[in-house]
Amino acid sequence: KPRFVAGSIGPTNKTCSMSPDVNNPAMRALTYDELADAYREQMEALLEGGVDALLIETIFDTLNAKAAIFAAEKAMEATGIQVPVMLSVTVSDTGGRTLSGQTLEAFLASVQHANIFSVGLNCSFGARQLKPFLEQLAARAPYYISAYPNAGLPNSLGQYDQTPADMAHEVKEYIQEGLINIIGGCCGTTDAYIAEYPALIAGAAPHVPAPKPESLWLSGLELLEVTPEKNF
């Protein structure tokens, strides 16, 4: 079977959208250009190392993600190597927003300019708690959908108690309902969890991406979808 390696690009420990000082809301720990340069250096090394895709993951700040997308385009231009760009978002609570405050629909609007292969969710919660947000993405995103949830939620000692079989039972709903194209595992998972997946996907139909929106999408913290019915 073919095997593909995605180069992982994490969110960094800095944010372009929020201040690290509650007494100075305008302060930023770094600039967009500084972050894009850091991403580009990493991505060029990954491309030269032979990765099959660039995976910008655990996205908590959309502006960080946009810097990473820009860096990916520049890195591929510099190296002459073109690979798919994958995005994976993390939501900060059961309200379904990123840490920087966006809904998932608003996030999609923010990155619609880019040539994206897939968009998905990782970390955040276990498979069952992540499902409602995965449904939101699957209904609106004109891309392939990925998911790699945690092995449930951590206990009081920071450990994960969910077994591979229990997690597979929850992930099976994603597959049966046609929500995903790419499945994996995040915090608390090991190869034993991933080993459960081949049996789940055998003969299953993949998710069919939603059509591209025909109306204008504008992004703030929430999506504004401009249609003829709206006087705007």
What does each model-found stretch correspond to?
Residues 1-232:
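Domain-level signal for soluble alpha/beta catalytic cores
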